[in-house]
C-alpha cells in the first residue's frame, strides 16, 4: 500500500538537444536531488514528465543510470505521447509545452505538498534542510530566490555534491530578487521573479487553481506568476524564504534573455503623452484593453504573444480582489482523463509496489 509522500517535485524533460549534454545534466541533477532529499530524510517523489519524446531518440528513463537512493525518494517518469503536443501555436518548432507538461505531473502528484522544478537547477543545502523540517503549512505558498551562475565548461558535472554547491555560490552573477511592481498594476505584492523554479504549496491549492493556465501557444509566458497570484486569491499567504535559494547554471537558451517587447510608434507616443500628463492609470488600462506592447521570443518570432499587461497584470488585478471566478484552465487539466505510460526508476521504502 502506497503511503502519501510529504513532498512531490515535478519536472519536465525532452531529449531533443535543447542544451548541450542534456541527458548527462539531467541525470546529474536528479541524482544530486535524490541524495539531498535522502540526506534530510524527506519522504518525497520526483516526477519527470517526458513530454513529446522524439521518436529517433531513447526515452529518458532508458538513459538514467543508477540514482542511488537511501529509501526516502521515489522517481517516476511519465511519458506523454507526441499527439498531445499538437495544436498550440508554435508546436512544430518547439517540442516542449512547459505548462502542459508540468500540469501532467502536478495532477498526478501524490505528495501533500507540490512544487514544480526545472530539472537542471540545484537546491541549496539550506533549502533542502528547511524542507526536511517537515513543518510546511497548507495555508501558505513558499518562495525563495533563484541565483544564476555561469560555469566556464562542463567540468562541474564531475564535482562532488558539496564542491558543486561551493562552486555555484562563487560564480553567482545575478540574483532573481523580489521585484517592486508598479502601483498602477493594482496587484498583490508577491515574489513573482523566477517563481516557476520554486512555487511550493499544498496539492489541494494546486487543485484549487487548476495548475498552470491553459496557453494557446508554446511560449507559456507569465504562467508561474499567474499561478502565484491565483493561489493568493484562493487564500494562500506567501512566505519568502530569504536564506534558502536555488542555483541555475545559465546557458544561451535561458528564457529572460530571449524575450523582447514590440512597440509601435503610435503606442509609444500615446503612452508618453498620458504618463506625461499624470494619466498613468489610463495608460495602463489602454495597454490592457488594446494589448500592447506585445512580445516576441527569439527563435519563435512568428508568434506575437500578448502584452504582460493583458496576459498577466489584468488577471493579477482580479486576483488581488479575490476574484476566484477567474479560472485559467479546464476541469480536466493535466490530461486527467488520459492514461499515460509511467515507469518508476527509483522506489522509496514508503512506496510499496
Task: Show where each model-derived region lies.
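Conserved catalytic core of nucleotide-sugar-dependent glycosyltransferases
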Residues: 93, 106, 124-215
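C-terminal catalytic/acceptor-binding lobe
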Residues: 187-188, 193-195, 215-353
Amino acid at each position: 500500500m502506497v503511503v502519501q509522500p510529504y513532498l512531490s517535485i515535478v519536472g519536465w524533460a525532452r531529449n531533443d538537444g535543447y542544451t548541450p549534454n542534456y541527458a548527462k545534466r539531467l541525470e546529474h541533477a536528479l541524482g544530486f536531488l535524490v541524495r539531498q532529499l535522502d540526506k534530510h530524510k524527506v519522504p518525497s517523489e520526483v516526477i519527470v514528465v517526458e513530454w513529446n519524446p522524439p521518436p529517433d531518440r531513447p526515452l529518458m528513463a532508458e538513459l538514467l543510470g543508477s540514482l542511488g537512493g537511501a529509501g526516502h525518494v521515489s522517481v517516476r517518469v511519465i511519458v506523454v505521447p507526441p499527439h498531445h503536443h499538437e495544436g498550440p501555436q508554435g508546436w512544430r518548432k518547439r517540442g516542449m509545452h512547459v505548462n502542459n507538461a508540468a500540469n501532467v505531473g502536478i495532477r498526478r502528484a501524490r505528495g501533500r505538498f507540490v512544487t514544480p522544478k526545472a530539472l537542471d537547477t540545484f537546491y541549496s543545502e539550506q533549502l533542502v534542510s528547511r524542507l526536511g523540517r517537515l513543518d510546511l503549512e497548507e495555508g501558505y505558498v513558499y518562495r525563495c530566490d533563484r541565483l544564476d551562475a555561469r560555469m566556464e565548461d562542463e567540468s562541474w558535472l564531475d564535482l562532488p555534491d558539496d564542491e558543486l554547491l561551493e562552486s555555484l555560490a562563487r560564480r553567482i552573477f545575478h540574483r532573481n530578487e523580489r521585484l517592486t511592481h508598479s502601483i498602477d498594476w493594482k496587484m498583490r505584492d508577491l515574489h513573482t521573479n523566477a517563481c516557476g523554479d520554486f512555487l511550493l504549496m499544498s496539492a489541494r491549492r494546486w487543485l484549487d487553481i487548476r495548475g498552470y493556465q491553459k496557453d494557446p501557444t508554446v511560449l507559456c509566458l507569465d504562467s508561474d506568476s499567474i499561478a502565484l497570484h491565483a493561489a493568493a486569491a484562493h487564500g494562500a499567504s506567501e512566505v519568502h524564504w530569504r536564506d534558502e535559494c536555488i542555483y541555475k547554471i545559465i546557458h544561451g537558451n535561458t528564457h529572460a534573455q530571449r524575450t523582447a517587447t514590440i512597440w509601435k510608434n503610435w503606442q509609444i507616443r500615446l503612452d508618453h503623452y498620458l504618463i506625461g500628463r499624470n494619466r498613468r492609470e489610463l495608460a495602463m488600462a489602454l495597454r490592457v484593453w488594446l494589448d500592447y506592447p506585445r512580445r516576441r521570443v527569439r527563435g519563435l518570432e512568428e508568434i506575437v504573444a500578448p502584452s504582460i499587461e493583458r496576459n498577466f497584470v489584468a488577471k493579477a488585478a482580479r486576483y488581488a480582489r479575490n476574484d476566484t471566478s477567474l479560472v485559467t484552465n479546464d476541469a480536466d487539466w493535466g490530461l486527467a482523463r488520459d492514461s499515460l505510460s509511467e515507469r518508476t526508476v527509483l522506489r522509496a521504502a514508503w512506496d510499496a509496489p
